[in-house]
Amino acid sequence: KIPMTAMPELVAGFHSLVGLAAVFVAIAAFLNPGAFNLGSPGNIKLGSLIEMSIGAAVGAITFSGSIIAFLKLQGIMSGSPITFKGQHPLNALILISIIVLTYLLCSTQSLNLFWFLLAVSFLIGFLIIIPIGGADMPVVISMLNSYSGWAAAGIGFTLENTALIITGALVGSSGAILSYIMCKGMNRSFINVILGGFGATDQSSNSQNKEQKPVKNGNAEDAAFLMKNASSVIIVPGYGMAVAQAQHALREMVDTLKKNNIKVSYAIHPVAGRMPGHMNVLLAEANVPYDEVF
């Protein structure tokens, strides 16, 4: 019952649950390592402790980051970038503190350090997402997808679960590759995405014209009539098609053009819509042939 336009929020919610599950498993393993064959409290195997710490940290970052992404997409929180002076140095300091805390935790196996590591990880997940604008959320969703995969893989090592390791690694690597491709399509830096270093606002929402203007209604045949003299047409669908649920009307227009021997194809930008593959799914709903999409 979730509309396609609300799918990014749903995906962000699922990512948050994956991250939270990784955190809970790490907590259970740290408090009761004997149940997972990791040793005894205060005497956990070093390798398992490193895996546990990394899985818990990445899981916490995924959880808090996904919650912020959900709030931004849902409109509960402003979709505009939220920045403040010294934000990047603070993020760098927190990331360094996570590394230091992980080292100290492996050395002392202190419960207080473990809780502090989780708290700091939750904080950095919040801080790296708030400066990203709503127009860039497709990249954020893909990046959080990657984070959730690595969190699952880290916990898979802790639990010695091969299936979880393989699945998490596949999700993590595919999400990272997709994020890189999307960043190239947007002319943005992949490193800045990881560090939460960019935040283009959605100009269409920030500069809305309040003036009321007349609306000209038309159907698929009217649109096709305007292009009747063309020999080839390339359609570039966007988020407006998703909001209006116009993919079926678009297909009707294309069918009319084809009857007039006009070649039609679809060009989809890597970050069109509000999540990766958004436009592809909508066109598939309208039974658009896949070989016409590029």
Outline where the language-model segments fall.
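Transmembrane alpha-helix boundary signature
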Residues: K1-M7, V23-S40, T108
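C-terminal ends of transmembrane helices
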Residues: K1-V11, S66-P81, I124-M137, S179-C183
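Cytoplasmic-side transmembrane-helix entry/capping segments in multi-pass membrane proteins
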Residues: T5-V18, P81-L93, P138-Y147
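Mobile "lid/hinge" segments at catalytic clefts and subdomain interfaces of large enzymes
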Residues: G133, Y147-I191
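Structured cytosolic domains appended to multi-pass membrane proteins
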Residues: E211-F294
